[in-house]
Structure formats: structure tokens, C-alpha cells
């Protein structure tokens, strides 16, 4: 279904009752306090909450930091860059990207992170695991690359690089088509434009759909993707939701199913940047339809469900960051259908790169700029 955003009266004002660093904006659910938590980050890309409430944040040039002193994340203090992060390809759209905590982080202190790995001739998407050591100086130990994208190398674009872990401990990773290799998204002999599923040690689960198929990469779970930069498990159903960038128009949200073909570049709803036609059509037998798409593009990045939102009207909603759209997009759901869209925070004029629901029930997001910020959205008091 095509996007049809609703508009609520939008404004901005100072709120004496809110924290001093907060602004108040209006939304369909009432007034919101938008608080700046941290500043001075260079193109922050991903957020992950540590058990004590502090934040682990990645910066695209290749740094990982912890935000917050002790359990007081709101103080905005940035740690020094963590030692142990591998060298990244920090050019074009490449760099250090997503980070998530292992489901058993409290026991093993394991994290997973995705980055553009430099190699002769370009770069490729890589997924690594490491142990986060917090004291006395935060660092990464036992770093091990558990997946490397195979296929034509990228000159700097479309790395994908979002991670999700399911209840069976398996890891999902998005990979992009490297922009110039869009036809490769339909080729099962490489990892371009795919959703990858592996075990935490990098081995392949035996029930992956293309295990044993001649010429197919066994790590592939689904294919026909362009540049997926949103990945989240729907807590109501356990299903994996993904979003990806279209070209000029045609950004998509998909519900991912085992072995399915999501169509890029054969079908879609966009056109090339020069106005040329890309797709055969918008539909084709054997290829999946998105549950939602945007024309014109919003350039989606980051995605989070909000089952425990501080705002009752938002519980169960899906939130998507918008880079070109410069907004936080709220999608109201009825089962697996999007029934309403609201564009939040356009007043900030910020490229929103990642969004997460915090343990406090507030929404937290990162803005993508050379002086990037981490912000928190909660009801205004």
C-alpha cells in the first residue's frame, strides 16, 4: 500500500515543565518533549541500550562509544572511542554501521556489529562479534569476523548492514546491492541485495532455504533487496520486518519470509535518478509485494516497534527514521497492515538515522550529521 501521511498541527515551543534542553512539539497524540541527550557525534549510525541504561553508539567514520556515566545516560557524557574496532571503509556510504547486543549479553558481554570492510578494489559488508569490556577503559576484545559478503565489491554505496537476532539465537543481516550491481540482487550465487541468516559463530543453520542448492549461497534467507537499512522483529507476531531504500521513489517495508524474492530490480515503484525506467512492472508472479511504500522517497533508516511506549496511543506502532524525509515516521498498524502514517518532528530538519525504544518506554533516535545528536522523545509534562 502506498504511503498516505496524515498531518497534525505542527509547532514548536519552549516548555518550562520539561527539562531545560527539551523542546515541545505537537503530534496527533499530544505534546511531545524532545530532549537532546548527547551531541558531538560524527554521523552516528546505530544505538544499542546496555543493561544499565547507558547507550552504545556507532559513528560512521569507525568509532564506537558509550554514552552516559555509570547508569546516568542522560548526562550525555561520551566515552573515548573503544579500542578494538577493526579498520573500516569510511568513504561514500561506508563505515561502521549497526550494533546489537547478544540476547545473553548479561552472561557473555557479546555484541555484534556490521561495517564496510576495506579490501583491494573496494569494500564489502562484514559482520563481526566481540566481547565488550567496560572497565577500566571500555574496549572490544576477542573480535572475530563471522560473515563477509561475497560478490562484486562496492565503490562506496549500498552496504545494507542492519542486524537482528531471533529467539533461537540466529542472526539476520541485511546486505545491499552495491548500487552498480543491482541485477545481482536476483543472483543466488552471491550475497548482494540479500537477507543473510547465520548462527552466532558464523556457521549456516541447516534449515536455511538454499542449503544444498547448487550454485546458491547457503547463508541467504531472502533476496531481491536493494539497500535495506531497517530490520526489526515484530513483538506481537515474532515476524521479521524490513525496510529498504528505493531509487527515486519506491522505498519499501516488507515482512520477510523464508526463501522469498522481494523483486528488486525486476519490480518496484520507483524510477532511476535520471528519470529512466528500471522495473518491468510493479507486480510479477513469484515476487513479493511490500506492505507499504513511499513515493516520493523518504530514505528510510532504522526501525523500531514500540510495544511499551510511554504514549498509550503509540503502543504497538512502528517507527522509521527518514533521512531525506527529515522526520520520524509513525506507522499505526492493524495486524500486518499499515492503516495510518504520521510524520513527526519535521521542525528539527534532521536526517534521522536510527530509532530505538528505550527501556524507559521513550523513543530515542540519532541524527546523521557531522555534529550528530542523540535525542529522546517522551510526553511533555
Where are these regions (language model features)?
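Acidic, Gly/Ser/Thr-rich repeat motifs that build Ca2+-stabilized beta-propeller blades
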Residues: 22-182, 230-233, 238-246, 296-334, ...
Amino acid at each position: 500500500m502506498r504511503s498516505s501521511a496524515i498531518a497534525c498541527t505542527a509547532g514548536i515551543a519552549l516548555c518550562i515543565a520539561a527539562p531545560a534542553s527539551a523542546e515541545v512539539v505537537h503530534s496527533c497524540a499530544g505534546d511531545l518533549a524532545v530532549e537532546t541527550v548527547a551531541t558531538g557525534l560524527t554521523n552516528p549510525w546505530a544505538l544499542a541500550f546496555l543493561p544499565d541504561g547507558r547507550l552504545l553508539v556507532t559513528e560512521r567514520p569507525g568509532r564506537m562509544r558509550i554514552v552516559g556515566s555509570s547508569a546516568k545516560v542522560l548526562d550525555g557524557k561520551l566515552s573515548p572511542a573503544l579500542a578494538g574496532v577493526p579498520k573500516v571503509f569510511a568513504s561514500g556510504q561506508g563505515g561502521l554501521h549497526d550494533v546489537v547486543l547478544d540476547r545473553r549479553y548479561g552472561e557473555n558481554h557479546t555484541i555484534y556489529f556490521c561495517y564496510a570492510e576495506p579490501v583491494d578494489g573496494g569494500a564489502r559488508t562484514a559482520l563481526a562479534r566481540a566481547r565488550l569490556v567496560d572497565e577500566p577503559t571500555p574496549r572490544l576484545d576477542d573480535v572475530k569476523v563471522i560473515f563477509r559478503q561475497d560478490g562484486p565489491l562496492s565503490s562506496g554505496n549500498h552496504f545494507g548492514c542492519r542486524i537482528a537476532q531471533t529467539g533461537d539465537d540466529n542472526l539476520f543481516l541485511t546486505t545491499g546491492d552495491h548500487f552498480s550491481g543491482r541485477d545481482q540482487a536476483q543472483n543466488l550465487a552471491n550475497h548482494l541485495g540479500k537477507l543473510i541468516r547465520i548462527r552466532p559463530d558464523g556457521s549456516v543453520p541447516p534449515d536455511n532455504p538454499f542449503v544444498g542448492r547448487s550454485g546458491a549461497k547457503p547463508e541467504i534467507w531472502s533476496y531481491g533487496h536493494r539497500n535495506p537499512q531497517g530490520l526489526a522483529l515484530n513483538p506481537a507476531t515474532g515476524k521479521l520486518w524490513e525496510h529498504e531504500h528505493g531509487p527515486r521513489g519506491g522505498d519499501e517495508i516488507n515482512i520477510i519470509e523464508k526463501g522469498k524474492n522481494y523483486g528488486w530490480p525486476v519490480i518496484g515503484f520507483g524510477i532511476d535518478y535520471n528519470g529512466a525506467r528500471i522495473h518491468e512492472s510493479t507486480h510479477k508472479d513469484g515476487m513479493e509485494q511490500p506492505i507499504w511504500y513511499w513515493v516520493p522517497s523518504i530514505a528510510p533508516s532504522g526501525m523500531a516497534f514500540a510495544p511499551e511506549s510511554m504514549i498509550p496511543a503509540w503502543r504497538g506502532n512502528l517507527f522509521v527514521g527518514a533521512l531525506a524525509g527529515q522526520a520520524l515516521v509513525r506507522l499505526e498498524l492493524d495486524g500486518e497492515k499499515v492503516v495510518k502514517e504520521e510524520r513527526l518532528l519535521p521542525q528539527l530538519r534532521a536526517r534521522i538515522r536510527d530509532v530505538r525504544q528505550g527501556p524507559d518506554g521513550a523513543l530515542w533516535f540519532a541524527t546523521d550529521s557531522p555534529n550528530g545528536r542523540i535525542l529522546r522523545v517522551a510526553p511533555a509534562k
